[in-house]
Amino acid sequence: MRPDFHKQELIPVIVQDYQTNQVLMLAYTNEVAFEKMLETGETWFWSRSRQKLWHKGEESGHFQKIKGMRLDCDQDTLLVFVEQIGNACHTGTYSCFYDELIPFDDSDIFSELEKQIIDRKLHPVEKSYTNYLLGEGIDKVLKKVGEEASEVIIASKNSDKGELLGEIDDLLYHLFVLMNQQGISLEEVRQKAKERHQLEGNKKEFHTRTAD
């Protein structure tokens, strides 16, 4: 399956962050630029203002490493998932879509939590609970994970949704601290989840015991 460049010479390309799905920019590509993307694994476009091929990041160093690509139902629009190096927008912002017309919170809370824990590790803050846990070492972190898991179980038995949500939140936080302590990133967890869900035949079968 390929874009239909016979229908129109230039087709729009929507570029998204492959981790957060944040829309970074909209550009246009022609058949030559499209082939360049397939060959190099980086984004190439056609600059309508300069009337020439445009290798994203060639001048700024803000390259886009292609992680995935999809074609729409009419074969005339591309959706490209990338690892963004630096900022996508020439204004210096990460995304070109920063002028908010109608407020919408598209933040990835788990990515933000991971970043916050990493920042605490690199730049310790006095009386920070995160720094306290990281400083105490693996045994303390594991103890807290166990305690919070038990609290989730108790809250579940109490049939109190509000309490359960709070305990799940506490457990997730401590799991993120453990991940940081063990050098595991959120992206690695996401990739492992994808591998497991995409694995063919990965289905649990329930068997009943029959009398002999």
Swiss-Prot record:
Keyword Transferase: no
Alphabetically ordered keywords of this record: Amino-acid biosynthesis, ATP-binding, Cytoplasm, Histidine biosynthesis, Hydrolase, Multifunctional enzyme, Nucleotide-binding
A Gene Ontology cellular-component term: cytoplasm
Alphabetized Pfam families for the sequence: PRA-CH (PF01502), PRA-PH (PF01503)
Reactions listed under catalytic activity: 1-(5-phospho-beta-D-ribosyl)-ATP + H2O = 1-(5-phospho-beta-D-ribosyl)-5'-AMP + diphosphate + H(+); 1-(5-phospho-beta-D-ribosyl)-5'-AMP + H2O = 1-(5-phospho-beta-D-ribosyl)-5-[(5-phospho-beta-D-ribosylamino)methylideneamino]imidazole-4-carboxamide
Entry's Gene Ontology molecular function annotations: ATP binding; phosphoribosyl-AMP cyclohydrolase activity; phosphoribosyl-ATP diphosphatase activity
Classification via InterPro entries: His_synth_HisIE, HisE, PRA-CH, PRib-ATP_PPHydrolase-like, PRib_AMP_CycHydrolase_dom, PRib_AMP_CycHydrolase_sf
Pathway the protein contributes to: Amino-acid biosynthesis; L-histidine biosynthesis; L-histidine from 5-phospho-alpha-D-ribose 1-diphosphate: step 2/9; Amino-acid biosynthesis; L-histidine biosynthesis; L-histidine from 5-phospho-alpha-D-ribose 1-diphosphate: step 3/9
One of the GO biological process terms: L-histidine biosynthetic process
Domain of life the protein comes from: Bacteria
Record flagged with keyword Hydrolase: yes
Phosphoribosyl-AMP cyclohydrolase: region residues: 1-109
Region named Phosphoribosyl-ATP pyrophosphohydrolase: 110-212
Compartments, record wording: Cytoplasm
EC number in record: 3.5.4.19, 3.6.1.31
Family to which this protein belongs: In the N-terminal section; belongs to the PRA-CH family.
Record protein name field: Histidine biosynthesis bifunctional protein HisIE
